[in-house]
Amino acid sequence: MWGETFDDFENDEGEMAMAKQNLIAEPARADFTFAKLPLGIQPVDFMKTHFAETAGKSMQFRKGTTTLAFVYEPATPADKGGIIVAVDSRASSGEYISSKSVMKILDIGDRMVATMAGGAADCQFWTRIVAKYCTLYELREKTSITVSAASKYFANTLYGYRGQGLSVGSMVAGYDKKGPQIFKVDSEGDRCQLKVCSVGSGSLNAYGILDNHYKPKMTDDEARKLGLRAIMHATYRDSGSGGVCNLCHITPTEKIRLPPMDVSKLWYEFADELGRDITYNPVE
């Protein structure tokens, strides 16, 4: 019982021995319950089929994603302006879709985020390092770090590990005393500032929409729809992109995360706007 000590058993050697045995016994093995894989997916068989010695393929997983960000000014006094950051949610390992619900917009500060493109582990780890540095800077200096300084620290850190196999293609976007800013950073230590940027295997498709519809001044609704539409087109033309569209709107005063939008629903909404019937009707 709780509160008892070995002195309570000094008159009974048998009970004392049993108490000691109970205290030094190995703990019971934890019983973890994991979610079952979807029907039809057998990872072991998949690996043997695609990457065994007889398959003729090397184990070099191709990565795929689509991330974008752009700066815009408010078109009316009722709009807030700022930065739109939009991403898909698919994580792929070559031909294998490993996840459909990855959050690729990672928080760095109150009004600053970083996106993920490349290796998920590399992006998540180094983004956490940058977020920790930004927090320590703000505690030490008693002021918020700028987007430029955060991205410079990110690029310098990655430059120190260039040539060692890292796979990082990130955008650091945020609002500071200099206004809205977007910096593109990669695993080679490159860093550049852009007003409109897209990174990932589906970036060419996203750029096609952004180049045609982006305007320096837009309403908040127009900007959000542009981000959603660019991601939607990328997911339908790039096999490495898919899932849902996660969108973040960074304004001068706050960071707004919108609910995830299914790209399939976005595709049908876009078709309705064009008056196009995309329903599959097989000819008998």
UniProtKB/Swiss-Prot annotation:
Keyword Cytoplasm set for record: yes
InterPro entries to which the protein is assigned, alphabetical: Ntn_hydrolases_N, Pept_T1A_subB, Proteasome_sua/b, Proteasome_suB-type
Keyword Nucleus on entry: yes
Sorted UniProt keywords: Cytoplasm, Hydrolase, Nucleus, Protease, Proteasome, Threonine protease, Zymogen
Pfam families in the cross-refs: Proteasome
Major subcellular site: cytoplasm
Family per similarity comment: Belongs to the peptidase T1B family.
Name this protein carries in UniProt: Proteasome subunit pbs-5
Organism: Caenorhabditis elegans
Taxonomic classification: Eukaryota, Metazoa, Ecdysozoa, Nematoda, Chromadorea
The gene coding this protein: pbs-5
